[in-house]
Amino acid sequence: MHHTGLGSGVAKRVLLASPRGYCAGVDRAVIAVEKALERHGPPVYVRKQIVHNVHVVGSLEKRGAIFVDQVDQIPPGAVTIFSAHGVSPAVVHSANERGLQVIDATCPLVTKVHREVIRFSKAGYFILLIGHSGHEEVEGTSGHAPDRVLIVNSPDEADTIDVPHTDKLVWLSQTTLSVDETLETVKRLRLRFPHIQDPPSDDICYATQNRQAAVKKIAPLSDLVIVVGSANSSNSVRLVEVALENGAKAAVRLDYADELDPALLDKVDVVGVTSGASVPEILVRDLLEVLARAGYTKVESVQTAVEDLVFSLPKGLRESRK
């Protein structure tokens, strides 16, 4: 084991995971709010947080975006953006009843799962949706066939979940889960329901998979892994878990560099750094500066994939992407 501890004389260094940070769906959603503010002027209303990041939401609020929990808090007729996490048909119906001018910033990879729910439920399937109850994405997805969807929160739940009829059964998932934990959940579902069908393609999205793969690469080499991301960001929280499961001696999540407890760096030679899919790169740069001041001036990039996916903007904003 080439792990180096106290007094080894090995230079302190940072392993910077790549890919990290913004995914295509987040980029599109944030630009949608910015463009809507440019085009319509403030206020522009957003149902829920546009993406699960404290910094992004705060900076858009300063520019005139108003974040609300439900559409009934929005004045009739106002410009309204649905967040990247997607909405149920019931929310769309409420928005239409209020005459809201809707811009739908749902990530296309979430919409794909919505379409799977619609297709499988129409074909008479019962759907086991692997995901976290109460998460906005899961609420939106399950809302497309509420009486045909059961949510499976964990591998343990797969062992006990009560399924009404099992002749036509399929599993789907939230886009931001731990790949390994989801495989374990599916394995256990299959033990109980051998004929359960798989989704037509991966529901866990490319960005979630890529960020987890990059963390797996740096984790075994790191004394500490720092994940930049917010507490309500499912994919960021998963990165901490994945780091710990793959050999990181310690792992923490923080929103801002100044939240880093210097005591965490005690006896630490190698710091792994990554960020969740809704995190602007400036927050990672701030962290690297704080680490440099603490002696971690050497930064090595560890790249496991190249991402070049870009989504076109939501309807109503398309011709103006810059």
Swiss-Prot record:
**Pfam families from the xrefs?**
LYTB (PF02401)
- Catalytic activity as recorded in UniProt: isopentenyl diphosphate + 2 oxidized [2Fe-2S]-[ferredoxin] + H2O = (2E)-4-hydroxy-3-methylbut-2-enyl diphosphate + 2 reduced [2Fe-2S]-[ferredoxin] + 2 H(+); dimethylallyl diphosphate + 2 oxidized [2Fe-2S]-[ferredoxin] + H2O = (2E)-4-hydroxy-3-methylbut-2-enyl diphosphate + 2 reduced [2Fe-2S]-[ferredoxin] + 2 H(+)
- Cofactor needs: [4Fe-4S] cluster
- Alphabetic keyword roster: 4Fe-4S, Iron, Iron-sulfur, Isoprene biosynthesis, Metal-binding, Oxidoreductase
Binding residues for (2E)-4-hydroxy-3-methylbut-2-enyl diphosphate? 52, 85, 135, 175, 233-235, 278
Protein origin, superkingdom: Bacteria
- Keyword presence, Thylakoid: no
Q: How is the cofactor bound?
A: Binds 1 [4Fe-4S] cluster per subunit.
Sorted alphabetically, the Gene Ontology BP terms of this entry are: dimethylallyl diphosphate biosynthetic process; isopentenyl diphosphate biosynthetic process, methylerythritol 4-phosphate pathway; terpenoid biosynthetic process
Query: What is the protein named?
Result: 4-hydroxy-3-methylbut-2-enyl diphosphate reductase
Tell me the leader sequence span: none
- Residue positions annotated to bind isopentenyl diphosphate are 52, 85, 135, 233-235, 278
